[in-house]
Amino acid sequence: MAGGAFVLGSTGMCGLQMLKAVEKSASFDKVVTIGRRPPSLESPKLKAIVEKDSEKWGEIVEKEAKGFKVLMSGLSTTRGAAGSDEGFYNIDYTLNYAAAKAAKNAGVETYVLISGSFADANSRFLYIKTKGKLEDDVRALKFKRTIIFRPGLILGDREKKKSAGEEFIVSILKYTYGNFLSNITNPIYAKHIGEIATTLASEPIPEDQTEPTVRIIGARELSALGKALP
C-alpha cells in the first residue's frame, strides 16, 4: 500500500516519532504535516506546512489529505504548557477534532490517535475528560478504521525541555522499564509508539469490511507491544 499519510503534532515527542516511522516506511511514499513551526526531520517524502494560525489547519488538512488513506495525530499539550484550561482544550480537543473531521471529509479511511490512559468524557479531571470527549467524537465520525492508543508512561526526548522537577521524576520512572514496576507504569518509548502506529496504519483494510472498526490499545498492551520490538 504505497500512499500518503498526514501526521499531526510532529514537533511533539510522539508525533515526531510517528513522522519518522512513516518517512522510513515503504508503505508510504509521501507524508504531510502541519504546525506552527517545522519539525526537525527533513526528507524528500515530507511536505512540512508551517501555519501559525491554527484556525486554518482544518481547511489545510482537508485540502492536503485528499487521496490519502491515513491521518495520525500525536497533537497534545499539558495544562501548564498551554497556560490555561482553555488553551489546553483548544489544542487537545478543538484542533484535533477539526483535523479529524477535515480528514474524514477528505476521504481518509484510517485515523490513529495518541490519547491518554483512563480517557473518560465523564471524568471531572480536565485532562482525562478532554481525552475522553475527543475519543468519543472521533469515533462518531466513523472512519473505516479508528485506532486509539492509551499509553502509560511515555519515555523519550522532547524538543521542549521539561522543568527540573519533571526531569527528575521521569529519570526515576525510567528505571521501571523492564522490571516488576512496569506493570504499574506501563512504560513505552515514543519511538515504539511511532513504529507501532505506522505498522497498524499501513495494514490493508479488508475489502469485505462493511462497518467501521475501532481498536483501543490500552497502556499494558501497548507497553508489551513496545517491549517486543527490537
From Swiss-Prot:
What subcellular compartments does it reside in?
Mitochondrion outer membrane
The reply to whether Mitochondrion figures as a keyword in the UniProt entry is yes
Q: Where is the transit peptide?
A: 1-45
Q: How does it sit in the membrane?
A: Peripheral membrane protein
Q: Which GO terms describe its biological process?
A: import into nucleus
First-listed, main subcellular location of the protein, grouped into a coarse class: mitochondrion
Superkingdom of source: Eukaryota
Where is it found, in Gene Ontology cellular component terms? mitochondrial outer membrane
Query: Which keywords accompany this UniProt record?
Result: Membrane, Mitochondrion, Mitochondrion outer membrane, Transit peptide
**Record InterPro entries:** NAD(P)-bd_dom_sf
Q: Which PANTHER family match?
A: OXIDOREDUCTASE HTATIP2
Q: Which family does it belong to?
A: Belongs to the FMP52 family.
Q: What is this protein called?
A: Protein FMP52-3, mitochondrial
Q: Which organism is it from?
A: Scheffersomyces stipitis (strain ATCC 58785 / CBS 6054 / NBRC 10063 / NRRL Y-11545)
Q: What is the lineage of its organism?
A: Eukaryota, Fungi, Dikarya, Ascomycota, Saccharomycotina
Q: Which gene encodes it?
A: FMP523
